[in-house]
Amino acid sequence: MAIRYIFGRAGRGKSYLALEEIKQKLQEEEDNKLFLLVPEQFTLQAERDLIRKQELTGMMRAEVLSFTRLAHRVFSEVGGLTRVPINELGKNMILRKIADESLKELSIYQSIAKQDGFITKLNELICEMKQHDITPTELTMELNEIEEETILKRKLEDITLLYQRFNNYLKGQYVDNEDHVNLLIENIERVEFLEGAEIWIDGFQSFTPQIIRVIEKLAQKVANITITFTMELNAKEKDKDLFHITQKTYLKVKTIAQKFNLDEEVINLDIEERKVLPKEKEIAHIEREFNTYPYKQYADEIANLEIFAGSNLYSEMENVAAQIIHLVRNRGYRWNDIALVSGGLDQYSMILKRVFEEYHIPYFIDEKRSIMNNPMIELILSSIEILSRGYQYEDVFSFLKTGFSDLTKDEVEQLENYVLQYGIRGKAYSEPFTKGFEKKQIQQKDKEEGEKQIDEEKKEKYNELRMRFIAPFAKFEKRIYRKKKIGEITKALFEFMKELNIEDKLNQWIEELREEKYFEYVNENTQIWNKIMEIFDQLTEILADESATLKEYGRILEAGFLACKVGVIPSTIDQVLVGSIERSKSHDIKALFVVGVNDGVLPFGQEDGGILLDHERESLVKKGISIGTTLESSLLEEQFMIYSAFSKPTEYLWVSYALADQEGKAMRQSILIDRFKKLFKNLRIKSDVVNDVDRQLHLITTPISTFKYMTENIRQNVDDKAMADMWWDVYDWYSKEPTWEDRRKLMVKGLFHQNQITYIGENKAKSLYDNPIKSSVSRLERFANCPFSHFVTYGLRPKERKEYQLSNPDIGRLFHDSMEQFTKEMVNEEIQWKDLTKEKNDELVEKVIDEMVPDFEHGIMLSTHRYQYLVTRLKRISKRAMWTLTDHVKKGEFVPMGHEIIFGLEGDVPPIIIELANGEKIYLEGRIDRVDLLNDEEDGNYVKIIDYKSGSKEFSLSDVYYGLQIQLMVYLDAILSSEEKKHQVEIHPGGIFYFKIDDPMVKTTEKVVEEVEKEINKKLKMKGLVLKDVNIIKKMDRSIGRSSTIVPAGLTKDDEISKSSSALPEEDFKALLNHVRRLVKEIGEEMLKGNVKIEPFKKGGDTSCKYCDYIAICQFDNSFHDNQYKNIKELKSDEVLERIKKESQKKLE
């Protein structure tokens, strides 16, 4: 019996020698077993290497195993495994159950124990403790020695509690991977196949105490053990840190040899004549000097090392791809001669896939993938949540959108639209859908019979979809009714999946993926059913008789899924191997690309997110309890890992980093880059920031990738920027390739694309817009804001998906409707405004809103507590608003003439008719919230227009001038015209106002109610324009003084209108009305000419794009020459009037 040690620095050929020795042993006529033991994640690569090494017809005597697999081999021969084995999935589910049940007893971890990530961390910690032979008893003893009440002590109390309960749960019934190893230790001496066997252990930097005990047992059983150590046997002082962990591991193994008096043999590959794998000089220099202090500098010219700085992550990966193509084409490399590693593979993974596919580089990403985003897992978890949470929208459509339900994609979208529009959830799914199909809606007087029939058909369709969705759930719910055992729920869940025919649907989907050549996803999804069944098996094996609510069951199941990873097998051998730097184990490679060498990525930033922090682990080490790695050992391991990676290739090393991330935020280079600069005197960092011709030439690789660069460069040429002549040669190549003809033409068209269209023509405009044109004021204002926005709204007419929620316009409509109904109630009860009391005001508001709420938007106001509170708030605001308006009436002489007055072809008041130059007419229509009238024998007849606003609205004459705010003027015009014709008397404008519906908060030191009310009334003062006539103003507010609390006006002590008042004489009112009519005519004519120009206004810092829903459609970009704002200047009132007068004069001339 002997232990052999193979020593050598990275890349000296230790693994190569081990494989050579196994090959030679296989050629001998012996029957003893040969085993190569490697870390679990490297078994596949080691098997490949072993097969590739052999030139024999068979290798039955040789096996590649991990220590876990060795345990299974032992148990298959001698038995000894009387307990049920559980994997990481089972452990996670048990720990989730234990943590949930122990929540009230936990101290530090009570809140975070509910989080998903906690169970994974707890599992890792328990694994570490078992691997280091630490029991709950030892932790308890340590706790007894800690007298003071520290956070560490409280943490250890929680950990000990959970660890002990976990062990108690397993005791006598179940065995995990760590217990497997302990059982392996107990059974090694009983195994016959290890008699006379030879073992090679390769690829380990260190061994846990548990594995050291395995090696100790093996050393007493097998003929000999050979262990490789990546270290220099007689390391100099400057290298001792680098090999510190390996040195400690070697000394532990050596102790075993000495303890049992075993023969020892040392093979040192660092001796010149034993070197088996020659490397290029640059790589050899990195291996020798990268981690040494002091170091030797490399002064020769550099041919096989490149450091590259990409302008961003994507650019970095594009240059990597171009260099890989270069190596394959110009240096004769095969794809599998190349590997790529990164410290931040998650950050690069999606970019890498896109770029490598664009460059036609075959690749394999060596990673264990989480199954949490797989649609099968989404289906199972959402199914549980549908029942446990009561058919919430998110759960229902997470389930339906997996593609495994019995509804098609179109049907899911139809059902989703209905559910969102009418707020369907909970019990509503178990009853026929009726919302939107109520009798009073279907039988509206303006509905045709055909529409009624369509409604009935829709109702039947939606209910048919509802039944097809809910039927399997009804059976599932029935099966688990009053069932509390996890085994029973799991069985019901499996039956539910069978009923949905999930396995066949999954296989069908896999075939579709295979046909579309998505082999990566084929590989993943062919494993998913077995993984799910494995989790179900673990549940029924270890938790079947445990009780759980459906919600708890879902959390336990999710914990199992979180622990589950799938490994994807390479689809071909000749491809670039991609992996994370910490777990990547490749065959012998010629070229290595190390990407993402940025600060915090490589070396890794300090992650201190475990259950025990680094300083707490250090504290335990001082007390003799070593739980896994400490910060110091982690840094040493990382140093060794980086050293191993940089030393891996034999011919070429590329190291790159990004100067910015995908969002453009600056990124710093790693300290490793500075190290390279010091080691290599002639090193020059290349970059694509300086885009020289050589760098551009380097990127001309494949037709797909090059096409993009060609387009970018020709775009620069079109924009009068410098471009290398070679790009015209590239363009010439594409122009001669028939397969690229269509894309080339599209590219040329795109280069000269103008993001603008001005007119679509009169005929198209007439076909788009209904004739005769009946226009609202808001439509005209939208055109004035931007013709294209008007075209989309009233021409294309896109519809937003309706959702069961209140928007600001809905709330505004509710206010308007309630105020309209309020006035109707006053009429019904024959109450005059001047007679209305505060009590009656509040009573009517309560009544009106209570009657409106149940039917408003299908009862949305009663659907949640939040909306029910909003009803209370709406009542409060409405009471304040109505009482304020009542107060206005009481303080003035104007009397409300009408509310919600409709002017239009079918309205109470005729429309405003504007005749256009081509003979067409525009009929202006609208609804006026309130019109007040003053009939005075001395002063005449005056009208006051009030528009209610639920939000803030300032009145601006400048906006009126530009057509952005013509609503009040049009309303005034409609009333003046109709009333004068109707009564054959002259009607004068009294004022136009916005009234904000609000119950504002005020800051005041006053405690007298009347004074507070006065402050509130100031806040509710109407905004707009009043006639510049003292008598009329006083008849709007008899109590007016220096400032009115009703209208935007005030009087001086001489009883004159103050300068701060928003007031105009009647002739200016008329001038404004005429100007608005001219504007309407101009807008109408442009509308019918087909003006759809993308031309939003810009006024100061404000633009009409700010609240526009169509910015994604027009794609307006001010940096384009043909996309420019219509700049308008903010005008003062006198400037507006002066311009209007000048324009009127020109018209007359």
Curated annotation (Swiss-Prot):
* Subunit field text: Heterodimer of AddA and AddB.
Q: Which residues bind ATP?
A: G8, R9, A10, G11, R12, G13, K14, S15
Keyword field: 4Fe-4S, ATP-binding, DNA damage, DNA repair, DNA-binding, Exonuclease, Helicase, Hydrolase, Iron, Iron-sulfur, Metal-binding, Nuclease, Nucleotide-binding
Q: Which residues bind [4Fe-4S] cluster?
A: C786, C1105, C1108, C1114
Q: What else is known?
A: Despite having conserved helicase domains, this subunit does not have helicase activity.
Domain (UvrD-like helicase ATP-binding) spans 1-276
Q: Which InterPro entries match?
A: ADDB_N, DNA_helicase_suAddB, DNA_helicase_UvrD-like_C, P-loop_NTPase, PDDEXK-like_dom_sf, PDDEXK_AddAB-type, Restrct_endonuc-II-like
**SUPFAM superfamilies noted in UniProt:** P-loop containing nucleoside triphosphate hydrolases, Restriction endonuclease-like
Enzyme Commission number: 3.1.-.-
One GO BP = double-strand break repair via homologous recombination
Stated family: Belongs to the helicase family. AddB/RexB type 1 subfamily.
- Which stretches make up the UvrD-like helicase C-terminal domain? 273-586
List the Gene Ontology MF annotations in alphabetical order.
Answer: 4 iron, 4 sulfur cluster binding; 5'-3' exonuclease activity; ATP binding; double-stranded DNA binding; helicase activity; metal ion binding
Function in brief: The heterodimer acts as both an ATP-dependent DNA helicase and an ATP-dependent, dual-direction single-stranded exonuclease. Recognizes the chi site generating a DNA molecule suitable for the initiation of homologous recombination. The AddB subunit has 5' -> 3' nuclease activity but not helicase activity.
Task: Print the organism lineage.
Answer: Bacteria, Bacillati, Bacillota, Clostridia, Peptostreptococcales
> Which leading EC class covers this enzyme?
hydrolase
Cofactor, how bound (note): Binds 1 [4Fe-4S] cluster.
Q: Which cofactor does it need?
A: Mg(2+); [4Fe-4S] cluster
Protein's name according to its UniProt entry? ATP-dependent helicase/deoxyribonuclease subunit B
